[in-house]
């Protein structure tokens, strides 16, 4: 961490070279800024227009020069312009005042809602928590979403990869998780939009307002802070906006002592931005053109996402897989840090099973008897083996029909279909679209429900009674209602 009144603060340097987003700046002897210090350039360009940008020092070159990466466009910069050392890293606003607001990488509000009502800021660079500060005992983070809690449970203070194409329900799942942590855990969320489409960022903001996650009338009642560095922005912004969002989350954990959800969409773009500036910084490219510091860059970000004795940051990261190649260095490096994967499946979404989480592809390191207990583990494995058997039988059913199956296989198919339907669930944030009240299902209710289905206790209930409900009691009530209506 940089001292509060560094000797280099206010030192003026001169821009000597501009190559795309990278600047070389010369400072007086003995007054070089430190690595990660922010430099501020405020001047007029050749057309007489104001130029204002912030750059972050990345390298000390010798000959009193430093090399810095700009956080915004370098159009209009010319050699000879003045750059001032701020004496500290980029700092962003933190605390309750950030909720319901949208920020850029520098912590400046970009939502036209006026200035942020806080003087509390924090630098975006800091050390990961020490081992002695960490909560090392694995603890399941209950989401209230049946398919996740049963088959791929999240670890409190862990990291989850969210895989899924366009239109399969990533955003709705993210919104529901934000809603549930606010209601059930009294926690807040931070959303880091890293290198994704501007339209998606705007759509997400509007959907948050519609679903009540952001309260437009009283921002203090909002449950999420947003930090965007979009696809059209320079690589410097995309490379650092994840750290800006993480810094906001760390304040809620360490100072407010809350459980925080940190969403990063998309973690691949963070790596991509690093590779864009790597060559300009004079580093030799590594495998597939990525930066040689790939492992360090990802590790520095991921190790700060942790559960401490004060509170936890549970991170859910959308992971783009280039050309569906899981061996690509970017996703491969990310996978090493993940505790769980939630895979969204288009085939399930097309069947109307929401959330469209694939029960066979999703996985978690938490799903072991020593952590979740024997009953949970046995139930989860029984659900997966039933669904796997159903998947194997689908080709036979498609060709020969159900009647050609053995009695045991027919029973397996019947129960698997009920299990598949029961894995669906109405969401609070989708109430305005579905007209159905959302459901938060406790883990013990989830386990009890699936046990009853697999034990054959509900074989006489119609399949449709299991669709889009919460607990197993609602299934029974729905079945009774359906029976009464059919008379």
Curated annotation (Swiss-Prot):
Subcellular location: Cellular thylakoid membrane
Record key words, sorted: ATP synthesis, ATP-binding, CF(1), Hydrogen ion transport, Ion transport, Membrane, Nucleotide-binding, Thylakoid, Translocase, Transport
Reactions accelerated catalytically: ATP + H2O + 4 H(+)(in) = ADP + phosphate + 5 H(+)(out)
Top-rank EC class of the record's enzyme: translocase
Record-linked InterPro entries: AAA+_ATPase, ATP-synt_VA_C, ATP_synth_F1_bsu, ATPase_a/bsu_AS, ATPase_alpha/beta_chains, ATPase_F1/V1/A1_a/bsu_N, ATPase_F1/V1/A1_a/bsu_N_sf, ATPase_F1/V1/A1_a/bsu_nucl-bd
The EC number(s) this enzyme carries: 7.1.2.2
Gene Ontology molecular function terms on file: ATP binding; ATP hydrolysis activity; proton-transporting ATP synthase activity, rotational mechanism
Membrane topology: Peripheral membrane protein
UniProt xrefs under Pfam families: ATP-synt_ab, ATP-synt_ab_N, ATP-synt_VA_C
Amino acids binding ATP: 164-171
The organism's place on the tree of life at top rank: Bacteria
One GO term describing the cellular component: plasma membrane-derived thylakoid membrane
Role this protein plays: Produces ATP from ADP in the presence of a proton gradient across the membrane. The catalytic sites are hosted primarily by the beta subunits.
Protein family membership: Belongs to the ATPase alpha/beta chains family.
Protein name: ATP synthase subunit beta
Organism expressing this protein natively: Synechococcus sp. (strain CC9902)
């Amino acid at each position: 961490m940089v001292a509060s009144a560094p000797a280099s603060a206010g030192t003026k340097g001169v821009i000597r070279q501009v190559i795309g987003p990278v600047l070389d700046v010369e400072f007086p002897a003995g007054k070089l800024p430190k690595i990660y210090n922010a430099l501020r350039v405020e001047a007029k360009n050749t057309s007489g227009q104001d130029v204002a940008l912030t750059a972050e020092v990345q390298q000390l070159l010798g000959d009193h020069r430093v090399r810095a990466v700009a956080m915004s466009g370098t159009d209009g910069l010319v050699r000879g312009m003045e750059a001032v050392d701020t004496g500290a890293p980029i700092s962003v606003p933190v605390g309750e005042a950030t909720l319901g607001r949208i920020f850029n990488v520098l912590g400046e509000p970009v939502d036209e809602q006026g200035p942020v009502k806080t003087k509390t800021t924090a630098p975006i660079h800091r050390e990961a928590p020490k081992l002695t500060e960490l909560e090392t005992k694995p603890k399941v983070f209950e989401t209230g979403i049946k398919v996740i809690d049963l088959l791929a449970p999240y670890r409190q203070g862990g990291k989850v990869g969210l895989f899924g194409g366009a239109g399969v329900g990533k955003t709705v799942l993210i919104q529901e998780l934000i809603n549930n942590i606010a209601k059930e855990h009294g926690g807040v969320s931070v959303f880091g939009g890293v290198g994704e489409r501007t339209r998606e960022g705007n759509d997400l903001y509007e959907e948050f307002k519609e679903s009540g996650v952001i309260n437009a009338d009283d921002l203090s009642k909002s449950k999420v802070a947003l930090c965007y560095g979009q696809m059209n922005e320079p690589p410097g912004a995309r490379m650092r906006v994840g750290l800006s969002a993480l810094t906001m989350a760390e304040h809620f954990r360490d100072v407010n002592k809350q459980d925080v959800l940190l969403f990063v969409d998309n973690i691949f773009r963070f790596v991509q931005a690093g590779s864009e500036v790597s060559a300009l910084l004079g580093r030799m490219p590594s495998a597939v053109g990525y930066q040689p510091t790939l492992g360090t860059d990802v590790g520095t970000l991921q190790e700060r996402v942790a559960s401490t004795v004060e509170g936890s940051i549970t991170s859910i990261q959308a992971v783009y897989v280039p050309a569906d190649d899981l061996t690509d260095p970017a996703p491969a490096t990310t996978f090493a840090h993940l505790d769980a994967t939630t895979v969204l499946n288009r085939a399930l979404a097309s069947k109307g099973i929401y959330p469209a989480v694939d029960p066979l592809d999703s996985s978690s390191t938490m799903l072991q008897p020593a952590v979740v207990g024997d009953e949970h583990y046995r139930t989860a494995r029984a659900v997966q083996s039933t669904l796997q058997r159903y998947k194997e039988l689908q080709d036979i059913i498609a060709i020969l029909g159900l009647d050609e199956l053995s009695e045991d296989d027919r029973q397996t198919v019947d129960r698997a279909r009920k299990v598949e339907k029961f894995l669906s669930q109405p969401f609070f944030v989708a109430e305005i679209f579905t007209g159905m009240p959302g459901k938060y299902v406790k883990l013990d209710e989830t386990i009890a429900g699936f046990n009853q289905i697999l034990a054959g206790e509900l074989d006489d209930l119609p399949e449709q009674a299991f669709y889009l409900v919460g607990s197993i009691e609602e299934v029974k009530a729905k079945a009774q209602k359906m029976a009464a209506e059919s008379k």
